[in-house]
Amino acid sequence: VGTVVLERLVRELNGVECTDFEPEPPPSKATAVTRCFGEPVREVAALREAMVRRAVRAAEKIRAQDLAATRLIAFAHGSRFKPNAPSASRIARLSPATNDPRVIGGMAGRMADVMYETGGVYTKCGVMLEGLEPMTAHQADLFAVPDPRSPALLAAIDGLNGRFGRN
């Protein structure tokens, strides 16, 4: 008695090919950047800064894979060991899909402002980007006026981050 995975493993060890070789892994469907704070955060400005940093890092991750996100999820919470600790999350639709850290970071900062509870003590926050799709496949906004300088700016930012680091 075993599982399907165990059965496949036994067959593979006996020389029977069960799955096709994938030279490239399939593209990600979501990515997340979450971190606990080194010390508790009590100010909205500190929470906003942390949320924006995580959002920009998540945007960098999907841009490196040439993907765009259609949904942004942000969360922040206090210690799970303390009663009545603050806990909040927000979901936003990104239309059109984007991997621009200026857009994603700006939205995450606004979400942090909305989630913040006065007097709350936060120990962790994070950002998830979902609904990832290839940049070539996403549908553009019919009425948007694209900035022709934007791709060059993002490439320059990526180059600087690659050369000097993110901080």
Language model feature labels by segment:
Residues 1-119:
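DNA-contacting surface of Y-family translesion DNA polymerases
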Residues 94-167:
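Acidic, metal-coordinating catalytic segment for phosphate/diphosphate chemistry
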